């Protein structure tokens, strides 16, 4: 499915994105990564772009020519930071999710995957997917959780 296909992974230097890049490389994909973080001990044969995805033109640029887009980017922080500076997380996430979805659509790609977060759920021992809209994100993840939920609705 991915052999010789152009694949974009946003957040490809992060914990999930990096693993995804390895899987896609093993499948023979041609990978482009978009991230704010400089890659450390990164893969060869991966096209890397250090870009701010809150800027729409950057999203257009990284989406151009892609067959598949995996949007796994997020904002890394401790659970305490969104409580201290909530809008520093909520607004950029809404902006880069919206920008990426629009740029992907405008690029003509036929395949886009948006990843959410466990932060969309309220605290529970066992999280059930059907329960996500019956409750609210925990206080620790309130605005990041809501921004991911909004991304789910957009996607």
Q: At which residue positions do the language-model features occur?
A:
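N-terminal Rossmann NAD(P)H-binding glycine-rich loop of SDR-like oxidoreductase domains
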Residues: 5-27
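SDR active-site strand-loop-helix element
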Residues: 10, 34, 69-73, 112-118
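Conserved glycine-rich Rossmann-like NAD(P)H-binding loop of the short-chain dehydrogenase/reductase
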Residues: 29-37
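Rossmann-fold cofactor-recognition segment
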Residues: 43-56
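NAD(P)H-binding glycine-rich loop region in Rossmannoid oxidoreductase-like domains
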Residues: 53-92, 106, 123
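Conserved Rossmann-fold NAD(P)-dependent oxidoreductase catalytic core, especially the SDR/UDP-sugar
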Residues: 98-141
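Active-site Tyr-X1-5-Lys
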Residues: 139-155
């Amino acid at each position: 499915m991915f052999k010789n296909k152009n694949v974009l992974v946003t957040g490809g230097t992060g914990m999930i994105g990096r693993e995804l890049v390895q899987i896609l490389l093993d499948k023979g994909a041609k990978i482009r990564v978009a991230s704010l973080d400089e890659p450390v001990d990164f893969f060869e044969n991966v096209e890397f772009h250090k870009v701010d995805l809150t800027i729409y033109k950057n999203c257009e640029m990284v989406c151009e020519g892609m067959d598949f887009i995996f949007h796994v980017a997020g904002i890394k922080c401790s659970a305490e930071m969104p409580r201290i500076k909530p809008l520093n997380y909520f607004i950029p996430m809404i902006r880069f999710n919206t920008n990426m979805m629009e740029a992907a659509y405008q690029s003509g790609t036929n395949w886009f995957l948006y990843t959410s977060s466990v932060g969309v759920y309220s605290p529970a021992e066992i999280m059930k997917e059907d329960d996500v809209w019956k409750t609210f994100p925990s206080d620790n993840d309130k605005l990041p959780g809501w921004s991911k939920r909004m991304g789910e609705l957009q996607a």
